[in-house]
């Protein structure tokens, strides 16, 4: 999939789940499942409940996403 096809959203992590997965509440009120991107896992960037994050989602499945940035 080309990078241009990804849709970016911002939201707040509502729950941290096992296996580096999270439940994220988007700005539009929808709750989705998300996982930390490979570079975030590699650099051991911690994501906790309440953190503001930016995630990308495929237009084909709007229930799952990949977290690619944690706001400070």
Curated annotation (Swiss-Prot):
GO terms for cellular component: cytosol. SUPFAM superfamilies: Nucleic acid-binding proteins. Pfam families: eIF-1a. It is found in: Cytoplasm. NCBIfam families: infA (TIGR00008). One of the essential components for the initiation of protein synthesis. Stabilizes the binding of IF-2 and IF-3 on the 30S subunit to which N-formylmethionyl-tRNA(fMet) subsequently binds. Helps modulate mRNA selection, yielding the 30S pre-initiation complex (PIC). Upon addition of the 50S ribosomal subunit IF-1, IF-2 and IF-3 are released leaving the mature 70S translation initiation complex. This is Translation initiation factor IF-1 2. It comes from Ralstonia nicotianae (strain ATCC BAA-1114 / GMI1000).
């Amino acid at each position: 999939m080309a990078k241009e096809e990804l849709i970016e959203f911002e939201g707040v992590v509502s729950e941290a789940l096992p296996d580096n997965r999270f439940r994220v509440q988007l700005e539009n009120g929808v709750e989705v499942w998300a996982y930390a991107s490979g570079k975030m896992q590699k650099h051991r960037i911690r994501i906790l409940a309440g953190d503001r994050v930016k995630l990308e989602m495929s237009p084909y499945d709007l229930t799952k996403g990949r977290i690619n940035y944690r706001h400070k």
